[in-house]
Every structure is written in C-alpha cells, then in structure tokens.
C-alpha cells in the first residue's frame, strides 16, 4: 500500500470532477476567469497527476468579472460510445439576483483532445453534470430562481432532463431533488451515479465556505423519488480535520473495484503565533491557496457510501493499493522559456484571453507585449503559476526598457484584480531613469509601499532579476541587476519591506471570491501599447 497525502492537487484547483476509463483516471477543475479554461489532469494510480493543459484553450472571457467565468466542470465517460463528455458553466456575472449563465458540453475520444466545438445545453442554472445509461444522456443542475419574494428560493431544487448532442434537450425538465425540506442548504454541483440497484445524487451543500459538505440522495428509479441521507458524506465543520471547506465531490471506481470520492478542500493559514488555526464558524480565517483537490476511498454500507477512513472528516491521508513511490508534497518548477516547452501543459494560466498575439516564446525567452493594468478585466498581458504552499519563493529575469511611468513589467503575486502585490521595472520621470517599484492592492486600498522614489536601475543594466518570498502571512521582495547579488527590497528606514500576503485569500479578496493565489509575469503599457518585455527565466519552489 502507498500512503497518499491530501490535497492531491495543491493550490487553486477547486470543484474537482474525475472519472476512470481504460485503467486511467482523468480529472477536471474549475478555472473561473483564467484560461486555458478547465484544467485537466491524468493519473494511473491516484498518486501522481500529470497536467494535460486546458480543455478550452481559446475561450475568450474578456470582461468576465473575477471569480465568474468557468464554474464546476463535469467530466464523464460514456462507455457506450467510448467518449468523454465535458460540461461546464460560463457565468457572466458574480453578484446580484441574476446569474446569467450558459451551460455547454464538448466531447472527445481522448481527454488530451481535440475537443469538439461547444454544444449549448441550457441556461436554467449552473454546475451541470451528465449521467449516461444505455445510450441515453441526462443532464442535472440546480435551477435558479431570481424572484425576490417570499415563497421563492434562489436554489430552487435540482432538475434533470434528457439530452442528445444532435437534438439538444428532450422532454420536460423534472425536479428530482427539491429544497422544501432544507431550503438553507444551497444544493449545487450535482452528479448522478449508479451502484447496484440504486441511483445516487451527490451534491454540494452549505455554500463554498466553512459549512460546505457533500450530501447524498438515492432512489431505485432515475427520476426519483429520492431520499436524502441524514448525514453528509464529507464535511469539515463537524471535525478537527486540517482540510476545511470540504465538499463538492463525485465518484470513480478503480479497476480493482475500489470506489473513491473527490472533493474540494482548503488549508487555513496557521495563527500568526504559529499555532494551528482553530475552527469556529464565526471566526475569521485565511485560505490564501484557495480551494484544492482532495480524495478518499469509500465503502458501501447499508446502501450508502461512507468514507473508508471513518466518520465524515476529509482525511489528511489515505491508502491506495500498490507499491508506487510516495507522492511529492512540495512543488518546484523552472523554465528558461527557450526550451520550446508547451506552456499550457506546464500549468501556465492567463487572465481571460490566450489568443491575440500578445505573447511569444523565442530564442531570448518569453516576450510579452504591454497590455492592461493588473486591475483590468479585459486585455492583460500576463502568465501565472499557482502557489501550492503557505511558504514559497518565485523569481524571474526580465529585460525591459520603459519610456513612461505607465509602462511596467515584472513579477506579480495576486488573488485577482482586487488583491495583488506587484514588483516591477518601471520609469520614474523625476529620477530620469528606470526603477524597481512596488504596487499593492488589497482590502480596497491601492498603495505604493516604497513611496514616490523607486530603486534606481543603472543605465548599463541589461537584465533585472526579481524575486518574491512568501512565509505564511509575510511577503518580501528582492532584486538583482544582471549577475549581481540579490538585495532585499527595503523600506525608508532600511528595514526589509514586509507586505501582507494574507490579503490574497478567499476571505479578504471580496464577495464571492473563488480562486487562489497565483504568481507570474506581466507587462503593462497604459501609454501607447508599444512596450515589450522579455522574460529569460522563471522559477518557483515551495519552502
């Protein structure tokens, strides 16, 4: 047996959905405003997960608000046609009474692609899932009710309807699991499976925060009526598990017959004194890494799935058959960009757009053409990697010759357009030279922590190296010129400038914040859009 440590996918990997086909496992996670949309992974043993890139590489999400975009993909395998189905939601707004969502499905013989052109499914709600049986396909999702009057509830039950790729929706949609007995549970993210003589619905409940969980319902008939299990399958608010917000899962069966459940989870920052965060539903906590992907084996008892580890707490570890090497629990990555690697299968993400000629990999490295500011929801020229730990370091090298203070390029650490720390090369007209500067945005405040005077870059310097180190709550920047020694960015008193890394978390980024901390490269030109920056290297490692 091999012990696997949760989360199996660390950092911003929410809403996992996986399936097993031909002896391999395939998993999809939400990407929201980031593209290539819908991150895909492959594994032979549930231990090592290889990124396959995004299923939707050319999706244009310009103008989509933060944490809108691609929600809760459902990846399923139809044995009858030997085909994978991937359905997903495009949410065009995040707040207000309306959701303005559209649901689509794409298909492929191989999860590596190519995937078909999207087929519209419906717009009645979000988080659709597909169930396949005897050549028929059924879509299930929560139906949304925006009417702000008594007697109506926004999460107005789970509805199911037959669907075909050729003819679209077939027959009438039926409510198969209502909210009359538990209006407050906010049921969403449904998946249907069949085991023995039972049909099961697995759905998320309790919202995306500390009360999140997986609830099961079952019926002998696909269309119901369904009875709800009195206890959740997975949750964290009833336990002392370090994996909080646990919920939103689905099931896959291994070739040896063992069943597994996937779920999202979050690891809170420890208290500032180093002690473990103590859970209290009314207490504030920080989850800078966002929601991650966990897994656990299940057993069937009295016709219900139960965690094989016992109880309802998301397990910190679990066992899988075989003698595979223990999984890596820390992550490291580096590139010189000139190696010809596929950026997308290496985990790079962009905000809202991939196409448009704003990036190029050549002999000198990665060149970015100046785009919008870090606060823009339209045309940013930016590539990022997910942060995977509460303590990590990243660095890059950049060649950049700005001519105006509105032209900048460098290393950005962000949660979204509202919460970021940005170390960059810019131009200072008063100093008459290039400078290293810092911009920060968080908690509704936009600041320049170094004040108006940046760190002067000598005219002879060709390449500036920029670094960031995050140690839980504390973030520090560093820089070096060409092959010179690293210097810590200091405040006016000569002390290391220590910034607040915790502003980049679900709880502080703002209402409906669903992503996680990322770090990467950006080039901004709010002057004449002519500036370009060439990044010769990038490296990330957990500490």
Kindly label every feature range from the protein language model:
Residues 1-543:
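Carbohydrate-active catalytic/glycan-binding domains of CAZyme proteins
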